[in-house]
Curated annotation (Swiss-Prot):
It comes from the Bacteria. It catalyses: urea + 2 H2O + H(+) = hydrogencarbonate + 2 NH4(+). This is Urease subunit gamma 1. It is found in: Cytoplasm. GO terms for molecular function: nickel cation binding; urease activity.
Length: 100
């Protein structure tokens, strides 16, 4: 399988998000990379589903709560920026204060 670096990054984020979901199901708090992966995957999949940039910017801030992450993680993540493929092209989506 010949994947571009961007495709490899997308797969890595998707896999990390799957791990994060499993940990949340078990009641395990997420660390920094897992939290970023979960929000990023939400944005990428939302774009593929046809949601707008504005919808994803708002909804992305409600994917995880402070109670679901380890101490200090919420303060470490001020913004998450994700390049996502929408029906009309690739756009940069910024989720401000993604863990509330």
């Amino acid at each position: 399988m010949n994947l571009t670096p961007r495709e490899k990054d997308k797969l890595l984020i998707a896999m990390a998000a799957m791990v994060a979901r499993r940990r949340l199901e078990r009641g395990v708090k997420l660390n920094h990379p897992e939290a970023i992966a979960l929000v990023s995957d939400f944005v990428v999949e939302g774009a593929r589903d046809g949601r707008t940039v504005a919808e994803l910017m708002e909804a992305g801030a409600h994917v995880i709560t402070r109670e679901q992450v380890m101490d200090g993680v919420a303060e470490m993540i001020r913004d998450i920026q994700v390049e996502a493929t929408f029906p009309d092209g690739t756009k940069l989506v910024t989720v401000h204060e993604p863990i509330r």
